[in-house]
Amino acid sequence: MRLQEIQLVNFRKHKELVFAPSEAITVVYGPNGSGKTNILEAVHYCTLARGLNRSLDRECLNFDAGYFLLQGTFADDRGIELSVKVSYEKNVEKKIFINSDELKKYSQLIGRIPCVTFSPMELSLVNGSPQERRRFMDNALSQTNKSYLDDLLQYRRVLQQRNTLLGAVNEKGMDRDSLEVWTEKLTQLACSIVSERLAFIERLFVYIEPVYEQLGLGEVPGISYRSAAGRHANEIAPEELFSFMMQRFREIEHQEIFRKQSLAGPHRDDLVFRFNDTDVKKYASQGQLRTFLIAVKLALHTLVSDTTGERPLFLLDDLFSELDGTRIEKILEQLEGAGQSIITATDRKDGSGVRSVSIEDLL
């Protein structure tokens, strides 16, 4: 998949801007605060229906503008074109169109244009809260597995309903039979989600190892899944997972009623990243964290490509910061032949297959 052209109107710093990257590696360079990242964010909107760093739609308006408009033209690896339009008007929900047809749900865009990102904000994936790592798994799986996205959206609805019911049992003494029904529904969806996540982590690890080796990193990487249902949940056969989780919910039912929330399930699970058998977020330096995250994203890019048969767009914000020249060259080597990569940087970068564009030339 590649971006042929994108137009920004009243988006962030840009009243109007047109950007047409090369089919390989494009580096958009310029000083901090000049609007480079805004271009990546606009592309991200057209692929995943939201901003790069989870900004609110209204925060993306250009100064006093009442609306913004993004129009992107993409082509898959077979050359078939796809147009995406995202329009937002202040105090009105944004609208998304694919080939002029308005989407009924934003989720219909997910997976149509595979996209992998790297951003300094995403360091929280490694050293932040479990929510960041769950979001990482959900985003990756939702782009490659439509049934996972459907299960995830349904799980969130059932979870909300069950939490409401837990509160009603606590406050009004409602009968628990209804709670059992919703627990079964939640558990069925939870088992599907956890099984897919475990399979995803296993596949991702296979891709991380060679990336580490090719980047010349000395550590031995590792990744594991931590279930809120108990430390042995990962080891249970898929056909036995439902019974295990139902039993777990029965054991903690009194706590859940007291706290009015579901205390087990994939919405409370976590990932643990390691190298040399130590937790990355506890012992890694800032430079090691950054390099580890880049390796994970390079591995994810290859995984998505192999899974979908379509090379995803690669959006990399401030990629070269805090990296030495040797490491930068190795990363660029990894990106060669990987499809289209759009990188932002403060300085021009030249190399094989690299086209550098000054942000000033786009304004």
Swiss-Prot record:
Family: Belongs to the RecF family.
One Pfam family in the UniProt entry: SMC_N
Entries under NCBIfam families matching the protein: recf
InterPro entries the UniProt entry points to: DNA-binding_RecF, DNA-binding_RecF_CS, P-loop_NTPase, RecF/RecN/SMC_N, RecF_2
Record bears the keyword RNA-binding: no
Subcellular localization(s) per the UniProt record: Cytoplasm
Biological process terms in GO annotation: DNA replication; DNA synthesis involved in DNA repair; double-strand break repair; SOS response
Domain of life: Bacteria
Keywords: ATP-binding, Cytoplasm, DNA damage, DNA repair, DNA replication, DNA-binding, Nucleotide-binding, SOS response
Binding-site residues, ATP: G30, P31, N32, G33, S34, G35, K36, T37
Entry protein name: DNA replication and repair protein RecF
Role of this protein: The RecF protein is involved in DNA metabolism; it is required for DNA replication and normal SOS inducibility. RecF binds preferentially to single-stranded, linear DNA. It also seems to bind ATP.
Native source species: Chlorobium phaeobacteroides (strain BS1)
A single GO cellular-component term on record: cytoplasm
A GO molecular-function descriptor: ATP binding
